[in-house]
Each structure stands twice: as C-alpha cells, then as structure tokens.
C-alpha cells in the first residue's frame, strides 16, 4: 500500500452513459495528466478550472477521445491531493483506454475505497464517513477475497503460478551468480528465458482482454454501404424495432446505439450511417464518423447486401472485422465463403452470426479465464519490467526481475525474497 | 568492586564491536571471555567480506566499527568480486592472516578503556525482574546496568566428529554451560542451530604445483581506504573433488551424525557440508574447492567448501582423493557444532530483550552466521546498551537505511529458522545502499550517536559536495551534442575519458570519480529506488503503539490480526512486510490508527 502515489479509477457506473469520468489523484497526477493530454497544459490550470482537448496515447500519439479536463489542486479536492478529472464520452471502450494510458504513464488503478480513504487521511472526511469506509472495506474485502479465490482456481492459477515459478527460478539463477560469483554456477541464458516468460505474459494479457470484455462489455459497430441492411440486422439481433428502417439509402445519417446482450456479454451495438462515395456534406460527415467508430469498436460487422453487386471495401480494421452478407433470402449476386450469409427477414444465419461474434470477442476458449483488474495490472507491471530487464546489466536485471516477480506475488501471496533465497540453494550447489 | 555500565559476554566479532561501540560513548565497559588471548579469533575461514557481507563491513566502518580496520591491517590477499556486474553487487573480499587479525583487533580494542576480564559467565543476575549484572562460574558478581550476550556457538555448544560428540564451544574450547538456562529463565525461546567447518591441512604436505592459482589483485582493495602492508602478498588456490571423493562419501553416509539423525540442530542451507553437496546434487561430477592460506607464514591451509561431519579417519581418505592433496596431512579435522540460539523476534530493533530491559544480544546467539553479520549486530547492541546505561532511548537503523537495517529487520520482524546469512538479494534498495556510499548514508548517524568525531562528517560532506558540484558541471557541459551527464550514460563512455577531455578545475579523487560515474550512469534506476525508499518511509511514519490490541481493530481479517499480534510491528511499514497481511488490512489499520490519534 502506498499513501500518496497516483491512483486512477473510472468514477461513473459501469455500462454506457452519456459521459464517462475518470479520476486521477496523488503525487504527480498533474504531470501524468499532462502527458496524456492534448490541449491546455493541466499543470498551468488553476484549481477548479477546466480545459477542452483530447486524451491521447503518448506512445502512439493516437487520440483516444475528445474530453473535458478538470483540475483540482491540493488540498481543495475530494481526496485532498492534486486531482484531475477527465470527462469523456461514456463508452466503456473509451474509458478503458483512458485508464490504460494513465496506468502506462505511472498511475495505479485504485483499490476499493481508496479515493475515499485518502480523503479521510487528508482530513476531508469526518469519523462517521470513515466508519462507512471501514464497513465498505470489511464487506468488499470479503468479496474481493472470494473473487480472488475463485479467480485463482483451476487453469488460470496454474498458469500464473507456472509463470511466477519460471521467473523466480531465473531470479534465483541471477542471484546465485551474483552472491556466489566464484562457485561455478553455470552461465545464464537470461534473454531467452525472459522472452519466453514475456510471451506467456502476453498470452495471458490477450485473454485478459477477452475476459474484460465479458465483464465490462464490448462495442460492436455495424458498417456497410447505404441500405446494405445494417439497421435491419441490428433490429433482428435486438429483436425489436430500434433503428429507423427505410428503403431510402442513407436513412441512418449519424449513428444509433443500442444495448444488447449475447451469451452474457454486454454489447453496445452501433449502427452507423452507410459508407459510400457521396457529395452530400452532411452524409460525408456521417461516413467519416462511421469509419471512426469502426476504429474504436472492439468488433466490426462489415455488412454487404448479397443481392446487389459487391462494392469496393472501405478501410476497416480487418483483423477485428466479421464480414456479413445480408438478404440471404434473395437470389445472390455473388458468393464469397469469407462472408456469413444472414437474413434479417427469415432469421436465417442469425444464430451463427451470434456465435461468431461471441467467438471473436472471447476467443475459442469462451472466456473461461476471468482476470480481475488487479491481475491485469500485475501482469502489465510485470510485462513492463521484463521488457526493461532485457537490456540491463546483471545487477539491474536482477532488480527489474524482482519487481516483476513482486507484481505477480501480489496474486499468489508468495514472499519473493524468501523464495529466491530458497531457490538459490535448492537449484544451485553454492555455499561453502 | 564498582559496577560497570555495560558488560559484554564474549570476545568474538560481535562482542568486540559491542565493547568498542559502547566504549565510544564514554561509559564503563567490561568484556568477559573465557580466553582473552582468543579475542577476535576467526574460527571459520580466514576471510572478511564477499557479496552481501562486504556491504555490512562498509556500514560497520561508516558507523565507526573496528572490523574493517582490523581486516585491512591483517590482509594478505584481496579481490573485488562482481566487478563487471554493476555497482550494487560489487563486493570486496579480504583474505587475512588469522593470528594477525586477532592481534590487530585486540590492539584496536585497547585504544579505548575496555576492561577485559577472564571468566565464564554462569548466569544473568536478575532480582525482582531487574537486570543487575552477571555472575561468573567462579562465583564473582559483576554489577552492570546493561549486558550484551555475544556468546557465539558457545551456548550449550556440542561439537561432532563423525558420530562422536562432546560439549565444546569451538574446537578445544569449553562451552558456556549455564548461560542458556538464564536466558530461558528470563522467558526467551531457545532453539538448536548447527553449523560446520572444513578440515585444516598442513601447508607443507600440499603439492601447490597441482593447484590452480588465484593471484591477489594489485593494487589491493581495502575497506577503510588504507590497504595493509601485506594486502597483495599471497595467492589463493583452487582444487576439485574427484569421483573417488564422491564414492567415499556415498559409501559412508551412515557415519555422518546428520544422516544418521544424531544432530537435531537446523543447519544453514548456504553452508552445506560436502556430504550434502554430493547427495543433493548427485549429477554434479565434481565440486570446486578453495584453498586459503591461514596467514603470511602459511603453516596451514583452509579447505573452503569441504566442511564435513564424517569421522576423522574417513576425512583423511577424502582429502587425499583431491588433486594436490595426495600426501596431505590433516592438522585439524572438520567438525559440526550445535548450539543454542534465541528467537530474535523476542528482541527490539535495538537488539534489546523485550522480556528483560537492559539485556542485549548479538551475533550467532541471535540466529545469524558469519563474522560480518555478528559485527554489525554487536555494534548496534553495544551502542544501545551504552545508551540504556546512560538513560537514553534506543536508536535503530530502519530497513531502508542499508544492509544492517535489513539484517535487523529480517531477524526481529520475521525471525529465522536457520542461521541467517546476509545476501544482496535480501536488500530491496541495493542500488541505493552500496558499499561505496556507506559513508554518505551512515556517517551523519555515527556522529550524532557519538560513535565518530565531528571532523569525520565534515570530511564526508566535503567529499559529496565535490561529487555534487562535478555532476552539476557535467550537466552544463556540452559533449557531442548532448550534456556531459547524458554522454556519460552511454555504456561505452567513462568518467575518466570525459575528465581527460574536459578536466574539472580540481581533479577528483578515485572514490569521488567513482561516485560521479555511478550516479550519472544509473541515474534513472537510482531515482526509481529513491521513490521506493520514500514509499517505505511513508509507511514507516505510521507508528503502531506498543500493546496494540489487533483483534479489536475493525476491518482486520482474523488471519492478519493473528499475524500482527505475533510479530508486533512498530509501524505500517513493518506490518506490510509480514506475510499474509494484505493491503485491505493495512488500510483498516491505518484508519484505526488515525482515529486513535
């Protein structure tokens, strides 16, 4: 636990809302905010002031969302520390990305009740409120324990432990070399082992992404030419008239969103305006917007009318795009096995489409691996240190790997220093 | 007879430093030992330092201790280990002349008015729950305000040669037969620990021509900056076990008291006997052995790596199976020793008994192993014993302050199930707590506590002012389009090369130049460790009052309450290091502490 380091959390309730709020508090909050912000420098803002701009990923320069940034300066903030609030669009995908860049820049996802706890520590709260925090900790501590237990059962637990095990053995090897430099400990193939451990961390994180979708919902975009049948498909998926369906191409000018649940995955389906070459400035804005939405979506359905000649494909993120051929009840104008034929009218192919969506979002394992935020954070931190360790001399490599191991130890409860000492003597014949 | 302020029991490396440090505070100190001629003796290998341990010695030196001075004066061979592996793990090891070391240690001790008394302490003199001094076996009473027990392996010591045993503290020396009872009567928990030592071979029976030579480094290294006159005098050597050695061991394991189950004591993992190595690493065909000269005249060599508790007859055969030792004559056989040690979790971080005020302990008695670990504790215990006698509060070295801090925190905070050895991997902040900056870290404390004169601090401060000034100069300097600091950060560049091209107005000493180089090259990692240290300090600032009723703290899990009640941490930082205590428990504890305040 740390009492001052920068922490961040999504402050708005889970699910889709008009706006979403991410809070960042602690020492260095303003500096972190400045790194992920394109707009007026938050470090120059007075307390209580706001600025308009964009949240960006400083690694790629990619803009994540337009947002309002509010600055509160210590002690005049909720926590009594420097605090920055980002107000973005309410999409869970956006909020998640904002959290990701904040964590990548050095903030830590807050523990349960941690904002409140800091407020109390800094004298922003009275005793009665503190009692409430305590009750929360008690209740949620129990819940967290049960969750952690459940999460650590079975396959995941074995994988994390195997990972930790390799890391500890590697660390023990380095330490055996450093603490017993003369005793003939075999030289280390550190780079190969680190790369192998890294690959496994990546694999777990990829699954984590799938399981976070399962927990927090995903954003699904329907993209296609005007009148390709996107709105009808959305209606068929939803089972009621949601989008405005009309035979006039380009009816959906902007976009429509609808909540949807498939196999327990909360989805936000976005039915975009059609994508076609157009002179109409209003419609063209809609097209650009549609492509932008596709970029942000977790999964894209590229919807094409099979009864009409096949149009030239728009620029889409194809790696996470499913191709759908609509109006399969009509005589086909073309055949393409990459496209999934469906009919919104008869319901043909809808079940297969749902299954394909589920698989694309959760992977073939069906998202059995559920990773909590804590586990994801631990893996992210471990990954960062492992990548760094690759290029370091032995003593610093040892320190970096030790931090990686500590991150994983948060999940397994192992005592890193003790484990390493134990393994030095178990695995190596050293000591005189 | 007048009373003492501090009585130190034992003249080993812990007792020496305890008496030396206590005397620095101007109190009246007596050191009681069975054999005053053997003060400062090295019962195991004739070397000081090595990874983890050299950092302890550097801190002892910075705190005004005597071990570094004695080792440098008696040095016959030095090596810097891990030279290429980074500043955090570079370690000096000094081979010493065994007799000269003891002599130098005794000479240094004589610089302060410590009364050395011959005798065996039989018991603590306790009346009405108050410590009044000690009683000796021959019936003397020595009144004292504070007592430091530094009995090494002597407390109810038993030595083993094969399956035969006899009471002894070390080879040829009687054990402390009664003191254990006294500690038990106070309420301390005693455990049996075990350690071992290899055979000593007559030097003139060894064929050195068949051994691999390890020459001493020139110029020699030192702990104090003043290498002794013989510090680059002698080589050390290496040999290896053979198939015949391994067969002899395997065929005769039943003769070992450990494998036969006679010894119950817990031995250290890091000091395995040759039997252990052969059994546990059966696929290794050969083990490296280090042949260390005992001194300048080298009448005896020490066979490092060959400790054993097999019977003497067999040891002869085993030794003769080694290349270069075909006609070797064993002068002293290897043996194992079992002894009492107390549970260090019953001590304060000033190494004072929680059960009897004024009683301090240090060294193997507290469950450690090694001269350096003993010396470090002796210094802290002696200092606090003197402060106790003067009515001053205990002083501590927190974990983030360095190796001694980690040593004490591990011992007192978690306890140990085997003799504890210092290792670099135990120290989270090892990049900040290097041997080379021990002076910067600890001289201010040493001066504040009266262990070193004020002038020393002025000298150290001047040194680091020059280092800081040079770093500022390099920051402003432009070299090949970048600042001097950035240029220095490139792995292929050195400070020496930079200073040649852009010399400072006054050249830096080699030590100062090294500081500049390390600080420039490792700036990013040092900064990260500094943040970690701040975090440790934050939690340290949350003090937990003595006698806190943990089960009554709302929100604490039962498991955590139990563990906290057992370990009795003094701060949130200490609580955080207890296995099984979670962040949510710390939060609950912090809220509770805040509420009480």
From Swiss-Prot, chain A:
Gene Ontology molecular function, alphabetical: GTP binding; GTPase activity; metal ion binding
One GO cellular component term: cytosol
Cofactor note: Binds 1 potassium ion per subunit.
Principal subcellular localisation of the protein: cytoplasm
Enzyme Commission number(s): 3.6.-.-
Cofactor section: K(+)
Residues that bind (6S)-5-formyl-5,6,7,8-tetrahydrofolate: 23, 85, 124, 432
Domain TrmE-type G residue range list: 217-362
UniProt: Mg(2+) binding residues: 231, 252
SUPFAM superfamilies xrefs: P-loop containing nucleoside triphosphate hydrolases
Pfam families: MMR_HSR1, MnmE_helical, TrmE_N
Keywords: Cytoplasm, GTP-binding, Hydrolase, Magnesium, Metal-binding, Nucleotide-binding, Potassium, tRNA processing
Binding site for GTP: 227-232, 246-252, 271-274
Binding site for K(+): 227, 246, 248, 251
GO biological process, alphabetically ordered: tRNA methylation; tRNA wobble uridine modification
Entry's localization field: Cytoplasm
Primary role: Exhibits a very high intrinsic GTPase hydrolysis rate. Involved in the addition of a carboxymethylaminomethyl (cmnm) group at the wobble position (U34) of certain tRNAs, forming tRNA-cmnm(5)s(2)U34.
Quaternary structure (record): Homodimer. Heterotetramer of two MnmE and two MnmG subunits.
Family: Belongs to the TRAFAC class TrmE-Era-EngA-EngB-Septin-like GTPase superfamily. TrmE GTPase family.
NCBIfam families: mnmE_trmE_thdF (TIGR00450), small_GTP (TIGR00231)
Protein name: tRNA modification GTPase MnmE
Primary gene name: mnmE
Swiss-Prot record, chain B:
Disulfide bonds: none
Name of one Pfam family that matches: GIDA
Binding site for FAD: 10-15
Function noted in UniProt: NAD-binding protein involved in the addition of a carboxymethylaminomethyl (cmnm) group at the wobble position (U34) of certain tRNAs, forming tRNA-cmnm(5)s(2)U34.
Gene Ontology, cellular component aspect: cytosol
Organism placement in taxonomy: Bacteria, Thermotogati, Deinococcota, Deinococci, Thermales
Intracellular or extracellular location(s): Cytoplasm
PANTHER family the UniProt entry points to: GLUCOSE INHIBITED DIVISION PROTEIN A, PROTEIN MTO1 HOMOLOG, MITOCHONDRIAL
Quaternary context: Homodimer. Heterotetramer of two MnmE and two MnmG subunits.
InterPro entries with a match to the protein in the record: FAD/NAD-bd_sf, GIDA_C_N, MnmG, MnmG-rel, MnmG-rel_CS, MnmG_C, MnmG_C_subdom, MnmG_C_subdom_sf
GO molecular function, one term: flavin adenine dinucleotide binding
GO biological process: tRNA methylation; tRNA wobble uridine modification
Organism: Thermus thermophilus (strain ATCC 27634 / DSM 579 / HB8)
Protein name: tRNA uridine 5-carboxymethylaminomethyl modification enzyme MnmG
Family, as annotated: Belongs to the MnmG family.
Keywords in alphabetical order: Cytoplasm, FAD, Flavoprotein, NAD, tRNA processing
Residues that bind NAD(+): 267-281
Cofactor(s) listed: FAD
Keyword tRNA processing: yes
Superkingdom in the source lineage: Bacteria
Gene: mnmG
């Amino acid at each position: 636990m740390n009492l001052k380091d920068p922490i961040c959390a999504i402050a708005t309730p889970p699910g889709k809302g008009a706006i979403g709020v991410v809070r960042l508090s602690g020492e260095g909050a303003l500096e972190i905010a400045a790194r992920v912000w394109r707009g007026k420098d938050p470090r120059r803002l007075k307390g209580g002031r706001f600025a308009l701009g964009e949240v960006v990923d400083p690694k790629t320069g990619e803009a994540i969302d337009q947002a309002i940034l509010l600055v509160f300066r210590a002690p005049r903030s909720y926590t009594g520390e420097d605090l920055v609030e980002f107000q973005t669009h309410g999409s869970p995908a956006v909020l998640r990305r904002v959290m990701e860049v904040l964590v990548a820049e050095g903030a830590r996802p807050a523990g349960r009740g941690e904002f409140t706890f800091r407020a109390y520590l800094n004298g922003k709260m009275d005793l009665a409120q503190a009692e409430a925090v305590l009750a929360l900790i008690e209740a949620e501590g129990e819940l967290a324990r049960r969750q952690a237990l459940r999460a650590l059962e079975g396959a995941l637990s074995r994988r994390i432990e195997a990972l930790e095990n390799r890391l500890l053995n590697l660390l023990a090897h380095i330490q055996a070399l450093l603490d017993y430099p003369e005793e003939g400990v075999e030289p280390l193939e550190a780079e190969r082992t680190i790369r192998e451990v890294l690959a496994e961390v990546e694999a777990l994180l990829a699954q984590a992404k799938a399981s976070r979708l399962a927990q927090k919902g995903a954003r699904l975009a329907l993209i296609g030419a005007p009148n390709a049948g996107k709105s009808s498909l959305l209606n068929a998926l939803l089972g009621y008239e949601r989008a405005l369906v009309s035979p006039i191409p380009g009816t959906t000018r902007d976009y429509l969103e609808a909540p949807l649940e498939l196999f327990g995955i909360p989805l936000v389906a976005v039915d975009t305006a059609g994508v076609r070459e157009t002179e109409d400035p209003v419609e063209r804005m809609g097209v650009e917007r549609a492509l932008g939405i596709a970029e942000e979506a977790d999964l894209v359905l590229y919807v094409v009318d099979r009864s009409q000649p096949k149009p030239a494909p728009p620029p889409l993120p194809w790696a996470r795009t499913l191709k759908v051929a609509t109006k399969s009840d009509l005589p086909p104008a073309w055949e393409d096995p990459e496209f999934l034929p469906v009919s919104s009218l008869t319901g043909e192919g809808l079940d297969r489409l749902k299954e394909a969506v589920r698989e694309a979002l959760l992977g073939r394992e069906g998202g059995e691996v559920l990773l909590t935020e804590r586990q994801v954070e631990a893996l992210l931190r471990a990954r960062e240190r492992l990548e760094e360790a690759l290029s370091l001399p032995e003593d610093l490599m040892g320190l970096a790997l030790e931090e990686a191991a500590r991150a994983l130890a948060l999940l397994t409860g192992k005592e890193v220093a003790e484990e390493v000492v134990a393994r030095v003597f178990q695995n190596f014949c050293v000591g005189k | 007879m007048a009373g003492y302020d501090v009585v130190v029991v034992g003249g080993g490396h812990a007792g020496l430093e305890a008496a030396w440090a206590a005397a620095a505070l101007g109190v009246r100190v007596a050191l009681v030992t069975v054999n005053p001629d053997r003060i400062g003796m090295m019962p195991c290998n004739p070397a000081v330092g090595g990874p983890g341990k050299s950092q302890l010695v550097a801190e002892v030196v910075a705190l005004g201790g005597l071990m570094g001075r004695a080792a440098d004066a008696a040095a016959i061979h030095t090596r810097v280990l891990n030279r290429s592996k980074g500043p955090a793990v570079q370690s000096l090891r000094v081979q010493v002349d065994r007799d000269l070391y003891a002599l130098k240690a005794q000479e240094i001790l004589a610089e302060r008015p410590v009364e050395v008394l011959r005798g065996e302490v039989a018991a603590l003199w306790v009346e009405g729950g108050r410590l009044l001094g000690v009683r000796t076996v021959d019936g003397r009473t020595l009144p004292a305000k504070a007592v430091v027990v530094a009995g090494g392996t002597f407390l109810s010591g038993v030595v083993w040669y094969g399956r035969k045993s006899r009471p002894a503290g070390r080879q040829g020396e009687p054990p402390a037969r009664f003191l254990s009872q006294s500690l038990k009567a106070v309420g301390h928990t005693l455990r049996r620990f075990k350690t071992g030592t290899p055979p000593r071979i007559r030097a003139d029976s060894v064929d050195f021509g068949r051994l691999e030579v390890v020459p001493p480094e020139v110029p020699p290294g030192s702990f104090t900056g003043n290498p002794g006159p013989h510090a680059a005098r002698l080589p050390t050597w290496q040999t290896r076990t053979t198939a015949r050695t391994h067969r002899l061991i395997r065929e005769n394991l039943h003769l070992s008291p450990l494998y036969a189950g006679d010894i119950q004591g817990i031995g250290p993992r890091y000091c395995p006997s040759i039997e252990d190595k052969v059994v546990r690493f059966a696929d290794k065909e050969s083990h490296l052995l280090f042949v260390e000269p005992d001194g300048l005249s080298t009448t005896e060599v020490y066979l490092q790596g060959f400790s054993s508790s097999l019977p003497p007859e067999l040891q002869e055969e085993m030794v003769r199976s080694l290349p270069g030792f075909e006609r070797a004559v064993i002068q002293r056989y290897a043996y194992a020793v079992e002894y009492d040690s107390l549970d260090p979790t019953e001590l304060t971080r000033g190494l004072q008994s929680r059960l009897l005020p004024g009683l301090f302990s240090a060294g193997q008695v507290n469950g450690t192993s090694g001269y350096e670990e003993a010396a470090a504790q002796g210094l802290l215990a002696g200092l606090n014993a003197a402060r106790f006698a003067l009515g001053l509060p205990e002083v501590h070295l927190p974990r983030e302050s360095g190796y001694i801090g980690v040593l004490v925190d591990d011992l007192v905070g978690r306890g140990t199930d085997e003799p504890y050895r210092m290792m670099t991997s135990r120290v989270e902040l090892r990049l900040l707590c290097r041997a080379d900056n021990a002076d910067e870290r600890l001289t201010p404390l040493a001066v504040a506590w009266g262990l070193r004169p004020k002038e020393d601090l002025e000298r150290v401060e001047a040194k680091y002012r020059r280092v800081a000034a040079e770093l500022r100069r390099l920051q402003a300097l432009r070299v090949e389009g970048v600042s001097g600091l950035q240029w220095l950060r490139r792995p292929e560049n050195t400070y020496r090369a930079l200073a040649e091209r852009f010399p400072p107005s006054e050249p830096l000493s080699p030590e100062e130049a090294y500081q500049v180089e390390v600080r420039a090259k490792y700036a990013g990692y040092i900064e990260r460790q500094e943040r970690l240290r701040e975090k440790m300090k934050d939690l340290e600032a949350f003090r937990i009052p003595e006698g806190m009723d943990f089960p009554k703290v709302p929100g604490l899990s039962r498991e955590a309450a139990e563990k906290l009640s057992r370990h009795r941490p003094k701060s949130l930082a200490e609580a955080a290091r207890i296995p099984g205590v979670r962040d949510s428990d710390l939060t609950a504890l912090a809220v509770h502490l805040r509420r009480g305040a």
